[in-house]
Amino acid sequence: MKSLIIGDCHGEAPDIPEEGFDLILCAGDICGGTDEMRNKMFEAMDTEKEWYELFGEEEAKEAVKSSIQEGKEIFDELDSLGVPVFIVPGNWGWTGENSDWEFLEGRGYPEMLEEFDNLHDLNFDCIEEKGWNFIGYGPCSGPEIPQYEDDKPESEEEMDDIQRDYEDKKQRLQKLFTCEKTVFLSHNVPHDTSLDKIDNEDSPVHGRHYGSVIVREMIEEFSPEYSVAGHMHEGKGRETLGDTECLNTGLNSVW
């Protein structure tokens, strides 16, 4: 079985061959986004406002519509290839997770996949294809449990909520790892590897690791044959953890 692997397109269509593979794996962040949107999202982390309030709600709605449309155009190209496409959402999938913005309801992921016959949502699911089991885990922009003191919330209540969410996600995934010959498709890479290290010397978190704790724990507990992920654009490449070959697809890459 030959797989085509796509990572973090961010609205830019990748250079996809027309044949030579049996299925496609997509690690999320297919939809686009502007620098201004990203800046407001980072800015909102230090305020009590949502990013779209800082951006201007009507302008934000138009920006999200444009982002989703860019994603759908790429999905349409993938769908036209006539092979199964397994996808997990990234943090640019407009899932509405961790957001009360009613505008997103029914617009983003996974609803945006419904018009395509060959696209399959793998988030917290297991699908068997050609003798292999594909397990998916979607949005995750950093360690599910904060690993650095300045990332930890101020209140015990917030930390308790984080812990409960982490335990819930971990247990949901553990129930899926029941078979051999497994490919684990996640948005974020395993924590504390060469694949998740912040190498940008201008970054305030230079040298830190912001991969997924849960992805690492699933690899250590179940040893899937392959771990495929993206999100961390800097860490493009491969690393082996135990018996698992791990791949960081990098930015707008095809493997």
Residue ranges and their predicted role:
Residues 73, 168-169, 214:
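Well-ordered alpha-helical segments embedded in enzymatic catalytic cores
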Residues 44-64, 68, 180-223:
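Active-site-proximal segments of metal-dependent phosphoesterases and phosphodiesterases across multiple
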Residues 18, 76-82, 176-178, 219-222, ...:
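Short, conserved loop/helix-junction motifs that constitute active-site signature segments
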Residues 1-4:
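Extreme N-terminal starter segment of soluble prokaryotic enzymes
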Residues 84-88, 194-255:
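Conserved beta-sheet core of the metallophosphoesterase superfamily
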Residues 8, 24, 29, 90, ...:
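Divalent metal-coordination and catalytic microenvironments
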Residues 11-129, 250-251:
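Core catalytic region of metal-dependent phosphoesterases/phosphodiesterases
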Residues 9-11, 30-35, 93-208, 250:
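Conserved catalytic scaffold of divalent metal-dependent phosphoesterases
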